[in-house]
Amino acid sequence: QLLGPALGALEVECQTQIDAEGVINSRNPEELLDVFSLLTWVKQTLNMTKIPVPDILTDRVAHIAPVLRCLRHGDGTLARFHGGGQGSEHILDQALAISGVRPSVPQDRAMGFARLNAGATSLIMDVAAPPLGPARFSAHASTCAFELSVGRNRLVVNCGSGLSFGDDWQIASRSTASHATAGIEGLSSSRFSHAKRGHFQALKETPKIVSVQKTE
């Protein structure tokens, strides 16, 4: 009696919270991993109990997998952007295996990030404006910031979320200065407004035009 409504609600959430390219509004890679892990668990459970898997669930899993592969470093962890940490490489590996989505050459762009590869070296860069809507309360001023890894060694990383260290560090970690990118006189590429949700301040005055071009 509860399964039908639960799956119906899940279908609505998949439709409204994840777009057709497997992207969530927050642009937080670790949050996307959490979503992906839960969806693959549901898919596996339905398969084991011979219950049809909703088409929208299968579709979103198929599109999230390559996004997460694009945002992985050589050690299997995720790039730290917009409040996300590195995530668990083991949880990601398990979720990818359960998904059944075969690995391919990583996308060079996904969820507002660009990826470059050369041998064992990979670079992941934020090439979009910070997210708006509710996500603006946790977004970082990280436009044009990057992380760089060689093999399993991460050489250049961002500070990540400072939330666990208190309000002041939470704000500081969201500023441009806490990211691997160029800054001008200590100013952030996006400004903080006075609007708050709990202890979180919203970003405002985000970059209007962010373009990227890849040349061989």
Task: Mark where each language-model region is.
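Active-site rim segments in enzyme catalytic domains, especially the processed small/beta chain
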Residues: 142-205
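A short, hydrophobic/aromatic-rich structural module that often spans a beta strand
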Residues: 89-90, 94, 174, 178, ...
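Alpha-helical cores of eukaryotic small-GTPase signaling modules
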Residues: 1-22
